[in-house]
Amino acid sequence: MRIRTDLALGDAATGIQTGTVSEPSVAASGSGLFVTGNWYATHSPDMGASWEFLDPFTELPADRGRFGCDQVVLRVGRLWVWLLQYEPPRAGQNNIQRLAVSSTGRPRSWRWWDLAPSDLVRSWDKVWFDFPDLGLTRRHLVLTTNVYDASDRWVRAVVVRWPRAGLTKAGPLPHEYWTTTTAGSLRPVAGAGAGGAGDTMWFGSTDVSSSSLRVFAWPDSSPSVTQWSVRVSPWDDSDYDSVGPAGGEWLSRADDRVTGAFRVGSRLGFAWSSGRRADRPHPFVRCAVIDESTLDVVAEPDLWSATGPWAYPALAPSVSGRVGMAAYFGERNLPALAVGALSGFPPRSGGAVPAWEMATVARSTHTPTDGKWGDYLTVRPHPSRRTSWVAAGATLQGGTNRRNIEPRVVVFST
């Protein structure tokens, strides 16, 4: 594993608007980067040599509520795509998720479309969106998000898709949507290249009660979503305790939501954080690889260690078809950012068993004051290097609070 670039984002890049629940996202073009996190956005036209800070609270109007948290960025063709989540204007009202696009990524260059729950169903006027993600197919940009009621209880998950061709045009952006009340926190698969995940968007969710993955497919050419339940090895969704020699805690928010997913050829992969079990003394990453034509599980390359916890995996294929990961490892229980790739993939009969080869990028000097970390990080295929990826994460440097968060952008390759 080769770390080609390791960029630490300073205060000028983030406006010191950082948080320990950092939720970083990154997108890359051939020459530029766009990075977001709680609660900043920043653009580099020269792969990190310089940065322009964009304040998510003021860059776009707060006419339908104040910016809250949760941002996702993607590169779609020649456009930077920036998704921002806003707070409800008043208690008991809708919030919005705002989809913004720009050809330059610079301040004051954006146009946008807003989406509220009641834009999908008129009677959804007292619920709110949370925990979004974006995926890409040949023809669509896909949003997955949860919906909660005024008492913060989960109600449903929603998948929305927009035609990619509409992103380049002014005016209304048509959408289709699908919803389920049986699976939440749906994670879309990542693909590589201009076509993204190809002609079908797959997405997945965990069901610990049946030791299953809920797997869904929405073809570009169809208005309908098909779903399956795929049995995998069991895991624990509660025991995320892991206090090491350095003391402290950073997994108080950990759960078993799928945080990484990919599609390579006919293989689908999903990864999530599991609590510890008898033969694995620390929380670890569960991973299942599925054949999309048979829905058989063909490999379960978990990532675990006898010396510390692994959590918050993000997955993406490279353009060459290798699968990359970014995740956090608790070395002495201090969260460290690590990246790596899956060897022995795709799995072959009689071949090597798929396994993760990981490298540590940066180690924290402290744990967060309140034990809160996560909820996700990001890895993307590098746009011009076929065997490389771009990842975004964060560590704590020199203290325990949000001002000590140091976001990082990493380019790595096999």
Annotate each PLM feature.
Residues 1-414:
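C-terminal PAP-associated
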